[in-house]
Amino acid sequence: MAQELDFETKVFEKEIIEVAGTKEAIVRGGRHLLPLLPEALQGVSTIGVIGWGSQGPAQAQNLRDSLAGTDITVKVGLRAGSASVASAREAGFNEEDGTLGDMFDIVRESDFAIVLISDAAMAEHYEEIFAALKPGATLGLSHGFLLGHLDNEGATFPENVNVVAVCPKGMGPSVRALYVQGAEVNGAGINASFAIQQDVDGRATDHALAWSVALGSPYTFQTTMQSEYRSDIFGERGILLGAVHGLVESLYRHFREEGAAPEDAFRRSAESITGPISKTISHHGIIGVFEQLDAAGKEIFNRAYDVTYLPMKAVLQEIYDEVRSGNEIRSVVVAGSRLERYPMPTIDQTEMWHVGETVRAARVEEEIPLDPFTAGAYCATMMAQIDVLDEAGHPLSEIVNESVIEATDSLNPYMHARGIAYMVDNCSVTARLGSRKWAPRFDYAMVQESFPALDAAESETKASSSFVGHRIHDVLDKVGQLRPSVDIFVAS
């Protein structure tokens, strides 16, 4: 059963929505709310954004732009000798006016310290960060990873600070891109979840909501920090990055083995997912993909769905169990030191991705096929992820954002523009590690289980029989009304 959470805000308008019989409290965003930010950020004169990885540049610039004309200053803190100093200067932060400095100095100066360094760096430096926090300050995180690490270590947050999370449901570049591209469209941006881990002065909720509104979130929904990190780490290893990578690699080879030309195999696999399938899901839900097909196409969709759902769900359940147990967090922490000796290799060197460069160069968007087999396999994997999260009791908004909206509105457009590496490697180190680790498992599941099952007269399971009536379609219909008000544009 999905969690039902509620909160109180002194500044913003809370709205109760009902999705599939479950009530959720949300706040709709929009630039008309920006004048409320100083009131919501009561007690805050300096916001420090620590780190300049995937989320740092987007969040620092969005916060600065949203707070322009107020008495609240946004500063960026980076480690000594950081290679990102030049990029931060180019974005308008500099030492001369005090908006760029050493990370620990900026933490000490901040009333609201938003720490966006890599998870491995967080695990290494959290004690120094905690020591630098002002008593009564608000510590902001965009990922609950640190809570999981503290639990593993038997440690806790300092008792004299607020601890909140605002977690955009998309990679950092898309958080900035939709904010800029939607400058004239009220509410454009990336949806976000928020969580309150500690509230020492009664201001934590409004601080978190103000942060989310300032980032441009069309709507902000509540979760817990534990639920967030479990769904987030799981999701990026699943359909958001790892699963879709493994799936398209296996589909490409499958179509080639059936006799398809390289370009056609790429169009039917990767292009079909990042083009018409993603666009249809974004605007009409997962069920919309099925409804677009003719009778023959629906039969192929169902066949692909039936042979894909259980093998992919088994891998997804294993990932969720590894995250819940703390093992996946430990793996990321250990990888932090290993990466200095063994940097992550590229992931776009197979035939498929070289063919993709040629296909994209000659692409006619309207001619990309919605392949029914690919659609069935992709939707089955997405639904399997939804079911794993639902069975674990996650909030419904969190489920659809981590499994559907983030995929179609934030991540897949980057693969569509420039290929798999451009999508995966614009994400956090934790996401990049997880995608590389688990993508081969999804590929293996398709090759060893799903494709051989096609030769059987009938699938042993009829997973597709529960697809059309699944309650997630009603949830997506409701939540889809709150989607970003513009479609992201990613230059190829």
Summary of predicted features, one role per range:
Residues 44-63, 363, 382:
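Glycine-rich adenosine-cofactor-binding loop
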Residues 141-237, 295-296, 325, 336-367:
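Rossmann-fold dinucleotide-binding core
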Residues 1-46, 78-79, 196-198, 213-222:
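Glycine/serine-rich phosphate-binding loop and adjoining beta1-alpha1 elements at the start
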Residues 3-6, 79-80, 89-148, 156-174, ...:
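Rossmann-like NAD(P)-binding element
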Residues 2-31, 188, 249, 257-492:
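NAD(P)-dependent Rossmann-like dehydrogenase/reductase catalytic/cofactor-binding core
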Residues 16-17, 64-93:
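NAD(P)-binding Rossmann-fold cofactor-contacting core
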